[in-house]
A protein has these predicted regions:
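Aromatic-patch recognition
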Residues: 67-70, 77-210
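Sec/Tat signal peptide C-region and signal peptidase I cleavage site
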Residues: 15-19
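Positively charged n-region of N-terminal signal peptides that target proteins for export
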Residues: 1-4, 20
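Sec-dependent N-terminal signal peptides
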Residues: 4-13
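Long, compositionally biased interface segments
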Residues: 210, 214-257
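General N-terminal leader/first-domain-start detector
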Residues: 20-94
Length: 257
């Protein structure tokens, strides 16, 4: 009950503050106000409770996930309209059949529990990532494997969750991210994934075909011919086609001894 009253108070306070502003002030302060309200709400909720839900009590702990993008025309949730199941590895133990989503703006794994209702809304929890080493999203025609990269000597990118697309002699990962853009007083979160490949010592972001081919050194001509033969255009290539290129390169390396 206390939890409900605090959340109700916070939203009432935000509505009162908004009503006292002029339209121009609301547009100008939109982002700052949203950030402030979310910060205050999370601080209160974090100090009150951690979620603990039945069989998943070890995994489902974190803070209340507030849909901060309510003023946006899009959702920074990865493939949110597609049905999926999910699993994750928490403290080296695997948990299956979890209702998970991934926030591409905050980089958080979101758990949705239809049995937890607060303020007439289904509760969502932003899971603590400290003990999550991996989570998988299973779509109808695709499986996405995410690994949390942290404190790894050979990893030269920002720590966080990356989709592991290929993990052979070559490495191929994707950082699924959204950025915040303001336009006409509205917040937008355009989705802009970044692809990285490691052929030698470090991960390099794929930017252009020329730069991509240079990664393969003296095999670049063979890779170019393979791409022409398979009619692969890098700008339009999906992750499966890029994986095929990497596998072809690995076969060349094996044949060369």
């Amino acid at each position: 009950m206390v939890k409900f009253l605090i959340v109700l108070f916070l939203f009432a306070a935000s509505s009162e503050l908004l009503s006292q502003q002029t339209p121009s002030q609301r547009r100008a302060d939109n982002t700052a106000l949203t950030t402030l309200l979310l910060k205050e709400q999370k601080e209160y909720l974090d100090s009150l409770y951690l979620y603990s839900t039945g069989a998943w009590s070890d995994v489902v702990n974190g803070r209340d996930y507030i849909r901060y993008f309510f003023r946006s025309t899009d959702k920074p949730l990865l493939r949110s309209e597609e049905e999926r199941s999910a699993s994750l590895i928490f403290k080296k133990r695997k948990y299956d059949d979890l209702p998970l989503q991934y926030d591409t703006y905050t980089g958080e794994v979101i758990y949705t529990d239809n049995k937890l209702i607060l303020n007439n809304k289904i509760c969502e929890v932003a899971l603590n990532s400290d003990n999550i080493s991996r989570f998988d999203l299973y779509f109808r025609h695709d499986t996405m494997i995410f690994k949390y990269f942290r404190d790894e000597p050979a990893f030269n990118l920002e720590e966080g969750f990356y989709e592991v697309v290929h993990d052979g002699e070559c490495k191929y990962i994707i950082r699924h991210i959204s950025t915040l853009n303001l336009s006409d007083g509205l917040e937008k979160y355009p989705y802009a994934p970044e692809s990285y490949i490691r052929v030698a010592d470090e991960y390099i972001r794929i930017i252009s075909t020329t730069q991509f081919l240079k990664l393969f050194g003296d095999r670049s001509d063979a890779i170019r011919q393979y791409m022409r033969r398979e009619k692969i255009r890098l700008r339009k290539a999906d992750k499966h086609q890029i994986t095929d290129i990497l596998k072809f390169y690995e076969r060349l390396q094996i044949q060369a001894g």
